[in-house]
């Protein structure tokens, strides 16, 4: 009887409890899709905000290197538009002030609980700690809210009239001034305009980082060698691709309140302003016109497919995408040409990467579980290799048009040992000169005679003069071998190097100037070298033309050992011989020149010392 009465009471209370729950829910204001105006970090982001009576909750997502740690300072705070601060009170999923080690997938979620803010709050800032370099996220607001940041209506709604075509492109160096304005910017953001652009013949892109003025403006000066692309923007917000011509001035503006949307950039000026607007203003819509991953296409293919069948798939995909570009409404002729050349560049890249993608597709379908299984399968695969494109890929705008340099794709002509044929005489000269400047090819007298354009010819002469000066300087260094072994056949190059050190153990470090792990390895090995300085061991460093000679020369001054700068073919042969899929690659040879140890990637000093000591033992 008592049980029945208790049940009756509970049933009567249920509606009341439901009402209480509903009332509590209504007291909580939620931003389901918070956006930010600027963050000085890409490691953490706010995914949801809740305003309750007792607390303001920020739901956070973090991405960082697996097994490395992050930390949220106990002093973290929120600040509203009036400057009032709300301190961190507790957290779930992370302990404030303590190191949190990232899981194997490099991602984690946690919740930060702050003192309650007014539920009518429209925008807030987050500061993780008090130090200058601690994480900061500015202008957090709900996606439905549009902050007033003083956007000039006439600029935001600027009309771009008329069509535009790409200019005839020639090597004609000149400066481009880029005027940048970020609306919604505040001095405390301390942001910079970052960007990059390519220069004919230079192996690495030129980069810039210019601090924004207090009013959100900045000026960047780029030295272009021909009409081409300058990428500029604010890190963790957005980047614009600006198509510019040497000698002109261009401008653009960024709406930080909508920084990650298609219409974030506006107010373009310059000879291709309309083209810049339609490309940067339609990024999401244009995504479907891009080529998808070639690796994915190959993975879905049949094991029995031939190279010709894969090539046919590439051609079919390229044709379909080009047709989609040509029918896409609202683009200028210049924008269509740029998009078509981008597709052609991707198609050439797919052909160039055929062997790698073919191998990776086979490995994916094999469902490899361990490193041993991976190595075993790799040895059993008969990977096809090509010294020329799978099919005749010409004619292409990327190679044959009078604006081909704009797409910066002529360098792809020498991606193969058998170059892609270019019929346009000027473009052929550009491709040859660029390949020479980047160290991909050498120029004999007959080849140099084909360079008839005076400006391009002067580039060749300048490179030869610089190389001569460099060689004279390096000749005075007994431990540096810059192109001194060019006449040695690739198959004999490593034996020729090792013969010099018979009777000693040799550690070979295959590296490049642009390789971060390689440079880290050089620093890490300094104590090891000091420890072994009285032993019969030599450290040999090998690189090739992917490393700019001037940069290489500067860097090797701080690396004890013998340094070899080889030809592309010699360098590639060593990597192929020792099945190196990456750098740094470390090889240890004993006193008789026999390989005793190989490792791709970082090696602990203790392990390396152990292997060197084994190599030093006389058999």
Label the model's feature ranges.
Residues 504-505, 522-543, 614-616:
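Conserved helix-turn-beta segment immediately C-terminal to the redox Cys motif
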